Amino acid sequence: MEMVLHSQNVWIRTDQKMALQQNKEVDEFANDVAICLASENKRLNPKYLYDHMGSQLFEQICLQPEYYLTRTEASLLKRHAPVITNLVGSNIRIIELGSGSSSKTALLLRYLSSQKNKIFYFPIDISVSILMESTRRLKSQFPNANIIAIRSDYSTGVDRAAAKCMATDGVRGKKNNINKSNNNSNQYSKLILFLGSSIGNFEPMAAISFLRSIRAKLHTNDFLLVGFDLQKDESVLTAAYNDKAGITDKFNLNLLARINRELGGNFKLEKFKHYAFYNREQHRIEMHLVSNTTQKVYIEALDKNFSFGKGDSIHTENSYKYSLDQIAALAKDSGFQIKKEFTDEKRWFNMALLSPS
């Protein structure tokens, strides 16, 4: 589904293809839940944390005092927007993966607007409601901006955004040429944003594969800006995922509520607890949902009962923390070179501007 904003209005185009896609996503969710709960080591893809409620809760997490990631990255974007724009060029098409509220990206858009540059922004997210809210807000701030919001996952979102980019420049070409990486520069540059340390949710080898897939869609004059959470004192890390207000608890437990809503589960949320800790050996935060007691859960869509012992857990998310050397190695292994790095004074967070090598 695409939302094309014009003036202050939002038009949503839905069709049979969209309905089929939604059914496919529910089937995929059900299948993954079935595999997870039947396994000895229960683990679900963290993307399932981000339904409508999960996305709203995550935006609240970003406002918590313990969650330094959002405000640190935002300060880097605000401070270095002139440098980023100078390196990338003023004639850019900004594509954001997992855009969420787009609050950080608005800082970059504000600088572009102050320089009288045209704004072309393509937020990609799996939450329709978040896209609607964020794009309406951006249009009120930047009434002349060209914003096309794309409801999609990462894998197909970039392709769809690239096609829309071509249309903004009057470029025409066959669909199978959109992804082709070559040395022919367009009249504009694409800047793909992958912020919020979302790269940390990927396993190390999967992170390489993912960035390689992005690299394959870029021309030599395109760029990728990635946010990395850096390795730091363990107490700072664990506090960020165990906020005193308990928002992260609700965010994690919402996954069980989602299974109840969408798949007819009968999880009793009070019988599970949120547990997040720092795995020193793997340099990652792990999030789990731990059963407080011996229990059985029935899921109607699967027509199955699943047993949990006291202490059994569902592994819901990893968040890897990087060193600067690991960032350099990841970029090289993925077919990128580091054009510029931006790090805060505490060296808690890093933004790397990458270009195809």
Language model features by range: what are they?
Residues 188-208:
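A short SAM/SAH-binding and catalytic strip from SAM-dependent methyltransferases
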Residues 101-116:
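Conserved SAM-binding loop of SAM-dependent methyltransferases across substrates and taxa
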Residues 42-52, 56-85:
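Class I SAM-dependent methyltransferase Rossmann-like catalytic core
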Residues 208-220:
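A short glycine-rich, Lys/Arg-flanked "PGG" loop and its adjoining helix->strand segment in the class I
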